[in-house]
């Protein structure tokens, strides 16, 4: 069982957590535990205890993983790292977005009077981020010279790769980027009163060019984001 000072770090794919796992192995001993088909790797980054896990793609996988981190490992905060598509013309491939909050852009019960994105029964449409953890990521980005943006992250079980879908999400939520896990992680953290932060490196423009850009820049963006997380976590000690 980890302590409340431990940070859970979630990536959806191997490429998003590979550098983190390598760094942990270089820092010292690691311990791996399997739950629900996921491998939870306990170790340290710098002097901070962490649990790193690949959750798999999508909202259900992300939510399941987050709840396991909180319930079984007792983490005190959760940091989601990975890649995303840009929804803002000023945010380029290779830039980083540190979330201010996160929304589920697929949720739509508007026919029953709810705002688009609002889950019936939920006390908020957008799930807030922990400012201390988010600022640590921003500060690390400034120190290593990464172009960083703050703003809303939109999540849903859909790879956004068309101008029409991009415009729909931007118009409804004024989000900076889109991906497939962050809002689910933030939702679980919100319900559990667990601090949360999301950082995403841009791999594509979430438009008609995404099918070309994403395979080209996926690994580069994921590595870039993981480096930033290592710097941020190391600064917390």
Language-model region placement:
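Short, conserved "active-site rim" segments that organize catalytic pockets and cofactor/ligand binding
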Residues: 4-28
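Glycine-rich phosphate- or other oxyanion-binding loops that anchor nucleotides, phosphorylated ligands
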Residues: 3-7, 31-237
């Amino acid at each position: 069982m980890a302590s409340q000072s431990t940070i859970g770090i979630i990536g959806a794919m191997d490429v998003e957590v590979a550098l983190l796992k390598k760094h942990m192995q270089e820092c010292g001993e690691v311990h791996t535990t399997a739950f629900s088909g996921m491998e939870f790797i306990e170790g340290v980054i710098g002097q901070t205890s962490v649990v790193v896990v690949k959750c798999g793609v999508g909202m259900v996988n992300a939510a399941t993983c987050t709840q396991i981190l909180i319930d079984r490992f007792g983490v005190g905060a959760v940091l989601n790292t990975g890649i995303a598509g840009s929804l803002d013309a000023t945010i380029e491939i290779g830039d980083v977005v540190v979330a201010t909050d996160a929304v589920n852009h697929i949720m739509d019960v508007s026919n029953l009077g709810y705002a688009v994105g609002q889950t019936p029964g939920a006390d908020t449409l957008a799930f807030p981020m922990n400012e201390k953890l988010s600022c640590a990521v921003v500060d690390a980005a400034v120190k290593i010279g990464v172009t960083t943006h703050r703003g809303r992250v939109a999540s849903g079980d859909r790879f956004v790769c068309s101008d029409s879908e991009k415009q729909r999400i931007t118009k409804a939520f004024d989000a900076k980027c889109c991906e497939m896990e962050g809002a689910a992680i933030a939702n679980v953290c919100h319900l559990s009163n667990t601090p949360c932060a999301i950082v995403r490196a841009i791999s594509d423009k979430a438009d008609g060019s995404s099918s070309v850009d994403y395979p080209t820049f996926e690994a580069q963006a994921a590595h870039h984001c993981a480096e930033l997380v290592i710097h941020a976590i190391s600064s917390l000690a």
